[in-house]
Amino acid sequence: MNATEAPRPPLPPFDAEAAARKVRMAEDAWNSRDPQRVSLAYTPDSTWRNRAEFVSGRAEIVAFLRRKWARELDYRLIKELWAFHGNRIAVRFAYEWRDDSGQWYRSYGNENWEFDERGFMQRRKIGRAHV
């Protein structure tokens, strides 16, 4: 993040309304399936644990999302606020997608988010199951 990058409200500490708004903003960005747009919500050195995969920094986030959406076609996501405290938010999610053979899948899971003081996500941990 450079000095000219504006904060991303709402900023922590979160109340219920701000946490719900942050979740909706993330849902909208992910449903755009635009890796660059999604990556801008994270700090330049953001770290992710996505099941067994570890991602660090915006460039790796963009690469991860490109790979993900190349195989998860017609991706559609719903995120729901689960809990929040201070600069942390927990989310439940469900999404549907199909592979290139036309087989549809549904994935469920939870995410734990930690934000910096400027409203950028600095840490994201996810657990997910496919059905």
Enumerate the language-model features and the residues they cover.
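Short, low-complexity N-terminal intrinsically disordered segments enriched in polar/charged residues
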Residues: 1-44
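A beta-strand edge to alpha-helix "cap/lid" segment located at domain peripheries
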Residues: 2-14, 63-130
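A solvent-exposed, acidic/Ser-Thr-rich amphipathic alpha-helical stretch
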Residues: 17-21, 35-88
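Sequence-pattern detector for short linear motifs
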Residues: 25, 52, 126-127
